[in-house]
Amino acid sequence: MKQYLDLARHIMENGTLKSDRTGTGTKSIFGYQMFFDLKDGFPLLTTKKTFLKGIIHELLWFIKGDTNIKYLVDNNVGIWTDWPYKNYMNSSEYQGESIKEFSDKIRQSDEFAKKWGDLGPVYGSQWRNFNGVDQIEYIINTLKTNPDSRRMVLSAWNPAEIGQMMLPPCHTLIQFYVVDNKLSLQLYQRSGDVFLGIPFNIASYAVFLMMVAQVTGFELGSFVHTIGDAHIYTNHFDQINLQLTRTPRRLPILKINKSITRLEDFKYEDFELVGYDPYPPIKGVVAV
């Protein structure tokens, strides 16, 4: 997608080198916005193959209100495993297990998963129980009864519980907007890992917009992506430069099961990606 490559190029050309929490180092800018009209296709990156299975399972996990990686691990999605594994490695119970062996223990033992697989009150907890408020339910009800409301805001940032989370929310605030019977969504993301995270976030919130539009009866509008600290880790420079040599291809189409009328009823099998023709994947190490 041109919007994504423009962001990456802008950071590489104009970003500032900064230190960061992980000790890796980044090139960073502050304040950037991208627009995606969903009538142009599903915004899944074509300049490298992107893990849609992980994106959809993670979103379903959020909607369930789940905060334990067991659901993800059971579905062979390891995008959140690094953080609890690091926590386990620092414990007295660690006996040299690899991350694969740790994942196997999560998969095989409910007791082990309960003790070591929970991330604290991260996204799913805040979406479904922010100090007792089910924000998803509120937004769905408001879209159905008062779609011109300016209060259709979903927040994952709960200052009182940040210290209990293994990783504080990066994509923090969502707002819905309706005009001409079209539903749009804007995301504010406080921190964006441009190589590994941002492609996931674009696709994830596009899927979320499609799901919410379907269950509330609206047509699709636009996804607006606003990023605070947009950064490229120094150990991803080569991967980003490779992507910048690739010409974006036609966007795919994401089909979803039209019979679903409740967000909670969606399953992975209800999504079908059509016409996806990406370049080969590009690997990169996540900064934990």
From Swiss-Prot:
UniProt similarity note: Belongs to the thymidylate synthase family. Bacterial-type ThyA subfamily.
EC number: 2.1.1.45
MF terms in GO: thymidylate synthase activity
InterPro entries linked: Thymidate_synth/dCMP_Mease, Thymidate_synth/dCMP_Mease_dom, Thymidate_synth/dCMP_Mease_sf, Thymidylate_synthase, Thymidylate_synthase_AS
Name of the protein described by the UniProt record: Thymidylate synthase
GO cellular component: cytosol
Subcellular location field: Cytoplasm
Domain of life, source organism: Bacteria
Enzyme active site: 170 (nucleophile)
Transport is among the record's keywords: no
Binding site residues for dUMP: 21, 150-151, 190-193, 201, 231-233
Gene: thyA
Intrachain disulfide bonds: none
Pfam families for this protein: Thymidylat_synt
GO biological process, one term: methylation
Chain residues that bind (6R)-5,10-methylene-5,6,7,8-tetrahydrofolate: 193, 287
Pathway assigned in UniProt: Pyrimidine metabolism; dTTP biosynthesis
Protein's job: Catalyzes the reductive methylation of 2'-deoxyuridine-5'-monophosphate (dUMP) to 2'-deoxythymidine-5'-monophosphate (dTMP) while utilizing 5,10-methylenetetrahydrofolate (mTHF) as the methyl donor and reductant in the reaction, yielding dihydrofolate (DHF) as a by-product. This enzymatic reaction provides an intracellular de novo source of dTMP, an essential precursor for DNA biosynthesis.
Keyword Nuclease: no
Native species: Acholeplasma laidlawii (strain PG-8A)
Quaternary structure annotation from Swiss-Prot or TrEMBL: Homodimer.
Catalytic activity of the protein: dUMP + (6R)-5,10-methylene-5,6,7,8-tetrahydrofolate = 7,8-dihydrofolate + dTMP
Top-level EC class: transferase
